[in-house]
A protein has these predicted regions:
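Membrane-interface loop-to-helix entry segments
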Residues: 127-135
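Hydrophobic alpha-helical transmembrane segments
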Residues: 1-121, 134-212
Length: 212
């Protein structure tokens, strides 16, 4: 099995799902401390948002994607029946995490979870655009941050900095997904250049976070 193969069980899928699904909410969690809002990390919250983000990005998104795409392209995955069973277990875990953190930190957690569920409907016949996964990355950062602080009542400058980092996540993920799907775009040079430009533009918001 080649590393770059696509599908739920592909090594490439697992690695990239961890990078996006687990590390982006970790970034959000670290922001809360870096901005001086919290004095100690809510460790349980960090673990759960990283776990939830990883499961959502890897299992939720890819069971749905593989179910609709296994007859369209070659994918390293399970049977359709196994995918549905795995999807069911995945939903139980994710809903449990969302409910628990909502009880611990407030209703916005559930809103972020619902957004995550919607953007995971990534397949032909459903939603199928790079932007939706980019929005997922954006809200993973915001969600990770919120779980740490537990409130929306923060100074406007704090939210501006959080939004800057979230837009960095959005654009970097969008640019990466365009590059990842170059084969779907028949290796269009315009799409390749756009992905590079968007990824570079993401750095502007990363820099803004540190200079504001």
């Amino acid at each position: 099995m080649k590393f770059e193969n696509k599908g739920l069980l592909a090594s490439f899928t697992i690695v990239t799902s961890f990078i996006t699904g687990a590390l982006f909410p970790l970034i959000g969690s670290l922001l809360a401390f870096n901005l001086g809002i919290i004095k100690a990390y809510y460790i349980e919250g960090i673990i759960l948002v990283m776990l939830g983000g990883f499961i959502a990005h890897w299992i939720l998104a890819h069971t749905i994607h593989d179910f609709f795409h296994m007859d369209i392209e070659k994918r390293v995955t399970l049977s359709k029946k196994a995918l549905l069973i795995l999807l069911g277990f995945c939903l139980i875990i994710l809903i449990s995490i969302a409910v628990y953190l909502s009880l611990q930190r407030g209703w916005p957690v559930m809103i972020f979870s619902i957004i995550g569920g919607i953007v995971s409907l990534y397949a032909k016949g459903l939603f199928h655009h790079e932007l939706q996964m980019a929005f997922g990355a954006m809200f993973l950062i915001i969600g990770g941050f919120y779980v740490q602080v537990g409130t929306l009542d923060l100074p406007i400058m704090i939210w501006i900095k959080v939004i800057c980092m979230s837009i960095f996540g959005f654009l970097s993920q969008y640019g990466w997904l365009l590059f990842y799907r170059l084969d779907d775009y028949k290796y269009d040079i315009k799409i390749k250049n756009r992905s590079i430009l968007i990824t570079k533009f993401a750095l502007v918001f990363l820099i803004l976070y540190f200079i504001l």
